[in-house]
């Protein structure tokens, strides 16, 4: 992943704010590994998924999350972009019946991700959104029927 200082054309302002919020959480935390773990779990990713996303082994992700290894600044930058892109996928999924893959592809490009990573990131975003939606629907049904 390459980072550039070019102006963002496709990335919406809300997503830039989302990135800043994640950055603040990770960088200002006394336990950045725990924050990283919480985001990974929020998006329903395994350590293997996160490793594939970050081009690291699962064991490296585990060491970062457990605080044995401090995440590098480069790791944190890529992590923030990855989580933001997955959030963009989820929002796109929630707002539209069909997803604008071209839009998401352009955000991924602005974030410095290769085109080859996009299908995996789309899969992670869609699966985590669908699981969350199913959980909410199940909870509503249980409340409706008094279970």
PLM feature segments, named:
Residues 34, 44-45, 71:
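Residue-level signal for the short linker/turn that defines the boundary of a DNA-recognition helix
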Residues 37-38, 48:
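Residues within the helices of the helix-turn-helix
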